[in-house]
Amino acid sequence: MQILLAALVAYLIGSVSFAVVVSAAMGLADPRSYGSKNPGATNVLRSGNKKAAILTLVGDAFKGWLAVWLARHFGLPDVAVACVAIAVFLGHLYPVFFRFQGGKGVATAAGVLLAVHPVLGLATALTWLIVAFFFRYSSLAALVAAVFAPLFDVFLFGTSHNPVAWAVLAMSVLLVWRHRGNISKLLAGQESRIGDKKKAAADGGAQDGGKL
């Protein structure tokens, strides 16, 4: 019962889509209506509003971190922590508050990994940054980071059958699956690069960010 309740709370936390909330609060178009139509920081950046993109990134990462931190803070067993990690991630992917139309989970997964272990989170984030810097593809960076996250986990904690390690692996698999469309576009040379600004219809109010 304790695990079920913790997972439910984590799912509800994950269901808060900061891309949609921040965009609405700042008078911007719904990120599900333009660009990749993905409610995530990269797509919000395509609106031209850097501040909104940063707030989205921080918010999505924070909710992942918060859910796992709370589970650890209240002394829940590793099985519960693993369930919480998966639940908050699934909440972002399929948010009950937004008709189950969520993002791809990159920032939320990063927050979860930071809460599991700071070194694990930072190593994975650094992997994303390196790939993104050299290739300018957010999706490619996410895919590479997703592949390396379980490997970093094994390097740090060994090959023990810790439930949290399985949660990390499950998140990586889900993240790759959520990027299946991006994989097709990458192979076809049609994927948008970081900084590309796609037309976003303003939903009342001007956008106050600069074009990259």
Swiss-Prot record:
Q: Which reaction does it catalyse?
A: an acyl phosphate + sn-glycerol 3-phosphate = a 1-acyl-sn-glycero-3-phosphate + phosphate
What Pfam family is a match for this entry?
A: G3P_acyltransf
Enzyme category, top tier: transferase
Q: Which biological pathway?
A: Lipid metabolism; phospholipid metabolism
Record's subcellular location: Cell inner membrane
Keywords linked to the UniProt accession: Cell inner membrane, Cell membrane, Lipid biosynthesis, Lipid metabolism, Membrane, Phospholipid biosynthesis, Phospholipid metabolism, Transferase, Transmembrane, Transmembrane helix
GO MF, one term, reads: acyl-phosphate glycerol-3-phosphate acyltransferase activity
Report the EC number(s), separated by commas if there are several: 2.3.1.275
GO BP annotations, alphabetical order: phospholipid biosynthetic process
The molecule here is called Glycerol-3-phosphate acyltransferase
The species this protein belongs to is Burkholderia ambifaria (strain ATCC BAA-244 / DSM 16087 / CCUG 44356 / LMG 19182 / AMMD) (Burkholderia cepacia (strain AMMD))
Source gene?
plsY
